[in-house]
Amino acid sequence: MESNKSSSHGDVSTSPSFLNNHHQFNNGGDIIPKKKKNRIMHVGSYEVGKTLGNGTFGKVKLGTNICTKENVAIKFIKNNKLSGKQKETCFREIDIMKLLDHPNIVKLLDVVDKREEEGTTYLIVEYVSGGELFDYIVAREYIKEKEARKFFRQMISAIEYCHANLIVHRDLKPENLLLDSNGDIKISDFGLSNNIQPGKLLESFCGSPLYAAPEILKAEKYLGPPVDIWSLGVIMYAVLCGNLPWEGDSQAEISFNSVHGNYEDPTHLSAEAVHILRRMIVPNPKDRATIQELKNHPWTNIDYQEIPKSHLPPRDAVHEIKEDIFAHLISLGFPNTKETRDIILKNENCGIVNVYHLLLDRYASKEVENLKSKLELLSKRKKSFSDKRNPSTNSLASIPEDSNDLSSNNNNNQQQQNSPPSKTNSSSTSSSNRESNNNSPSQGSIKEISLDELDNHIEQLDNDIENSDNNKSSSLTRRSSDPNKDIENSLKAQGLFSSYSAPGVPNSDHNYDFETYQQQQQYQQQLHQQQLQLQQQYQSQIQSDISFPHDDVEIESYSIQQQQLQQQQQQQQEQHKEDNNKPNTNLRRNSIAVSTFMEDEPNEMPINNLYKMNEQIQQQPIIGGSGNVMRSQFNQTLPTIDQQPVIEAPKTRRMSLDSRMLNGDQQSLVEKNQHMASPRTSKGIFKSSTTTTKSPEKTIIELKRSLEESGLFTKKKGPYLFLCFDEDNSVKFQIEIVKICNLDLTGIQLKRLSGDTWKYKDICTELVESMKL
């Protein structure tokens, strides 16, 4: 695009190319800047929507499946902005999430890798609409033991599942614990997770200092599972108490208490709750509780009949190790020894066996998907092969039913005579292949079939299709000097005929009356002459500029000409209907009737009708921006009889804004405004920080008053949405007024966007308490 240079007077360049690219003109010649089109981005089969937040490696946007309309979360990973260590961490997260399948873990649905084209990798993950557990805590100040026990059991189940598969999370905190629409926990963000290698210690410093175990803060080598147990204990303390266990006047004092596990027991909790917290928040990892102890703790199973499920599927023993899966297992860091193979074959209850079975399940699912795609490709190839062997009917022509077998036999005889013996053999081979294809898994009963056999099957079908195309093309190599005859002959070879010609008469049909054929030829010539006259009159009217007559004489002559045209067309229709009503036993069923210039039945519309419809559509008045009525000129003339007609769909005119408003967009615009005039509806009250019986309008007034008194920087993002920022603490969050579904209540939802979590909690608590609800 050319750069816009400014002249000495500061005017922007108005070159024709610039104006054409960036502006459009109205009737008065004024420049109207073009509106930017909202381009919809697609990633795979998902439509990208609004931004949900920022993840560890990039933005997270809402996605919608084009077919199922299911919502997903799409993580954008810009590979060129990641360091070598970050790339390793990122793709390790992808490998780990591919292996996990647990109801309380966010599921990775798909990976769209476009590193070579766009330098971006897209992770399609499960969309969790309930927000963070931390926001849920802020909304209630703290959570009662009964509800906290439900969350705890779900977290134990997910963590045990990870540890059993030799995966440690290492970054458990309330911000990475999400709530779905049913209020269940979903563990997310496995960016800092790692594989637990038997006999090896981890040494990476990672996680949040407030939730990290003492061995990580002291930069010691550590085991994986005890680290997650410590973080789980700190999370449960925050859930039950609404604040962290570490207190102090300075950051150094807080860090000291965190490393040594110094905290006071909350007085409002039961003895069982205090005890289970003390078993998890233990500085020495060797003395810290295990998952099995927590599952069987009395507090965990109050009001429950059984301990939390791990959702580990039963594993059958394997009798043979697949080398490709074993190589993948070794790439994850497991030892390549005979002992590892023996453990897998013995099916011992250990992490190596679980990881091997996870990889085995993953490879099996891939093979199933490949098999499905191969079967779909096979069915498509077979369909295209049958379509080429048996050409279907045209929208303007149909093959007579009585001549199907006869015409196909004639075509086959011609192909066998003109083709060499090798091609004849290939055709017989293809027929045998088609018989064998009827027993394929795509049509008959499901049989065991390998991918190699499917590939050979598809390759054979391709050869058959190519041979059939060569046979068809060789039968049409001879062409006469007349191009119209060439077209007619090629159509007759397939049983199809031009819409200007009479019904085709194959040479082998002796039942067809020759006198009837001559009568139809004469009738065809008469129709052609009448159509030529109408075309000449119509073209002369176009050339004489009949745009809207201004004088009365011109209006009268114009109306007379239109009446004459209509009378001639009506006469043609009546004459054609009389001819059609005459009984004729020699005519075949479903033969191609010669259509008149204005046919009533849409299924037998001639080509001239399509051009006529095109002209009528283009001549309809279009409401412009100034309200004037305009006429569009014809860009193409009607085809003559000698020309082979090219069938085109009628061009639909682009509707102006006024005409769209008249056609119903105005009502949708009103409905949209009505939707914006009311607050969003929220399912349940657990997402709201507080509720009130006041109307949304009165709640807005009270919220504005509290925001003015708080001194927060506030920006209104919508009728019921506010963006708030605390400059002192660098905390950014949003407040939204919602309607509670099925309840006559108004809710206030708070969501942290950035900044320290516990400073955000203090600000929100103070703000909600100042509101008189």
From Swiss-Prot:
Q: Which residues form the KA1 domain?
A: 724-773
Q: Which residues form the active site?
A: 171
Q: Which InterPro entries match?
A: KA1/Ssp2_C, KA1_dom, Kinase-like_dom_sf, Prot_kinase_dom, Protein_kinase_ATP_BS, Ser/Thr_kinase_AS
Q: Which UniProt keywords apply?
A: ATP-binding, Coiled coil, Kinase, Nucleotide-binding, Serine/threonine-protein kinase, Transferase
- Coiled-coil blocks: 362-390, 445-474
Domain of life where this protein originates = Eukaryota
Q: Where is the composition biased (Low complexity)?
A: 405-443, 561-573
Report which reactions are catalysed by this protein: L-seryl-[protein] + ATP = O-phospho-L-seryl-[protein] + ADP + H(+); L-threonyl-[protein] + ATP = O-phospho-L-threonyl-[protein] + ADP + H(+)
* Annotated Polar residues bias: 1-27, 468-478
Give the Protein kinase domain ranges: 46-300
Q: What class of enzyme is it?
A: transferase
Q: Enumerate the GO terms in the molecular function aspect.
A: ATP binding; protein serine kinase activity; protein serine/threonine kinase activity
Query: What is the similarity comment for this entry?
Result: Belongs to the protein kinase superfamily. CAMK Ser/Thr protein kinase family. SNF1 subfamily.
- For this entry, the protein name equals Probable serine/threonine-protein kinase MARK-C
Name of the encoding gene? mrkC
